[in-house]
């Protein structure tokens, strides 16, 4: 244990972890699951080390004070029941105490079910990255853990590092952030011959680094090490922080900007051209570069349960289009995509646009946090940043550039502007998080939610409930540690009972197009502070509607039990109980929503530096450029004027491509779509559209593609399974057929296609 904790604090921490995950004697315990306490896995050791090395000093002092408080109440000597009562009493004493206890609870559960262990002879030593590491709790959950050792491969992008304490570079444009927006702009400008420098706060990883271990992934790929709670304790924020940004960890649902949103942005915010064919071409180009398609979007058990339930209720569904390379697709690895894709099938920004930028001369630096934007005479002059790597090397980095793109993501972009003191009164003011929740269905047969492609069947029945707002329902891919941490803890015994049900659980999640908004500010040290409250009446109505809808779909799909999480307890409905499901839903609808009463998750943060035509309510003008500082551009999800009600990756990229053209004009370049390498076509839908006059020139290519697909079916039996699934999916898809993209299972009349955004009219 770290020397930063006293002996008494170490003892209290060990007992605290064992209170959350206790040793319980039962008559039948063949795997030792019930008898195994958290400390037997070394959880208290890891948590204590994290407290000292990872938690900022002000928070750390508060967490350690809680340990002292527990010691003063006789926590070490108390029985399990007494300790549980002490924890509940402390949590109810103040919001600060509740937040501290929640930290210990969530971290203990995450580590107990997520940590791998070294093999014998020293089973108490825990490592984050042991390639062959296993966790003894995984056996009862049916979780395989890591299934393959990654192949050693060199990184395709060679990043630059400072050679001394100070480093200065000259560039035409400095891009802060390497995610969906920053990567697209970097490629567009570098491929036109401009000098591009990209700064990324996180590190670079590739498939060689991905060992399919969730704790390692959260700490290295995710923003602030995993689910980050807002400052007011209401929303868990999920975001990427690595080279490639959120595209490295997302679940790949590629949805085009809905027509409804595009029209609204033009009418209310003045974003000229967003409703035009030119914007369609922006989306077409990024989809082509990402190999977006539905070839590998088949249904695992969770997705089948949603589709079955929706069909029985006559709810509209759609099949996801995802950015997989079909030639590399492996369903055994697909469920680990949120932990970093080992197979190389996932077409992330790192593997596509950033690689294009690098091959055209862009310089990319990781471990580099932008402190402020340099401004001279009202114009951008560059970026001042701090380099700090895991080896302890630090340096001051200055990029001199007349154009600066802020693309740090909606959680960090406003913080950079606030640290610089630019952007106007709306900076950080309109944080949309597309708030979401989850309902768990327990089925008779095992569901194995970590196997196969996540998020392939979606319920689109309520994307627009009449006023342009509603909710979208889909399927996640959770690993055991995350499951354990999001299931509320009421007692050690109850939580273990619920965890034994995990193999049989299918999880339905949803997110809203939110009307209400939160805010991003900075603290005294300049760090981003996020607040959000689900206080808007429309948002509350839609959140409750989504909860009820998920329960009805589970019931229709055959779930024997439905579990709904409040922040401090789990509420259950069973099929054989006297209370009807509708009565249960009515009872749940009276539960509070505000102040963290129900767990809310956000994977999509937007609008904190939004574009628009009103200087009081927007940060950038309608082209993406700041009004008060020329040459500073917004190039990420924070530029969106409103919430989308759809997964935002394609929209972020299309808007970034639009903004990139404006920057190219400023630099004296041309407006042109990126010259992407020709993709490998695997379906008629993906074939390039050619003029009728050239139809005979297509025949040799058509024959080549037909042979390639048939050869793939012969040499890889899994491709045959995928093809069969595609055929069955097409036969069973209900609802409308989109005239633009041909996808079936679409929303009802008057709505829009959730695949390509086209307006749907019967």
Language model: regions and residue ranges:
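Redox-cofactor-proximal catalytic regions of oxidoreductases
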Residues: 56-57, 216-295, 507, 511, ...
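FAD cofactor-binding and catalytic pocket of flavoenzymes
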Residues: 250, 424-554, 561, 571, ...
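Short, cysteine/histidine-rich loop/knuckle motifs that typically chelate Zn2+
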Residues: 739-740, 755
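Beta1/beta-strand and adjacent pyrophosphate-binding region of the FAD-binding site
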Residues: 165-179, 197
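Glycine-rich loop(s) and the adjacent beta-strand/alpha-helix scaffold that form part
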Residues: 184, 188-214, 236, 242, ...
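Short Cys/His-rich micro-motifs in 6-15 aa windows
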Residues: 757-762
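Conserved redox-cofactor binding core of oxidoreductases
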Residues: 110-112, 119-156, 160-161, 272-372, ...
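Acidic/polar surface patches and capping/hinge elements
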Residues: 2-116
